[in-house]
Amino acid sequence: MNDTPENRRPLKSRDAGWARAWAAALARRGVSPDAVSAASVAFAIWGLAAFLCAARFEGISRVVALLGAALAIQLRLVCNLLDGMVAVEHGRGSPTGPVWNELPDRVADVLLLVGAGYGAAISGVGWASAAGWIAAVLAVLTAYVRELGRGLGQPADFVGPGAKPHRMAVLTLLAVVSAIAEPRWLAPGRGLAWGLILIAVLAGLTAVRRTLRLAARLTPPSAE
């Protein structure tokens, strides 16, 4: 990963002491940012497995699985934070860094959103699998529009309301709420299913918004 500052997602957590310490520790141990990016996919697979296990479990086992999914989502985001810090702040970026920065992110998005959808569907909300796929496609579309802009010589546009941090925050919250509220106050899978609809709507709005902003940047100002 060798992005210039204007092409990096603005994150306040990048200045957090723990993030700086972890990035420095990884750099000292010779861990490449590409390996950190790849690790995010491993955590996404963990999250997918946790959602599917939760669909088969009841009681405390389901609670543990859902909380495990929430933890996996957050660890995926930690990897997304640290890969860039190791690459940029510690000068360990590689020529293939941009590839590792983007592709694992898209794979992780699909694994987590589709996993949540199938988990909710197996729990009894049949249409949730389709909601998961729709959310995943729209999530990838938001990144496509951003990278399209960069390919056209424009700065990366990370505007929301359904950018990656927003999507993962909603999905994490849904997993935690489901763990707490099911089955007494919420039918199993129902919260995840409707949450995926929300994520799809937010991602769709984001794709449209980024497209309009890109078109505006590419359109020359009219002559007075």
Annotate the PLM regions.
Residues 73, 84-130:
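Basic, amphipathic juxtamembrane/active-site segments
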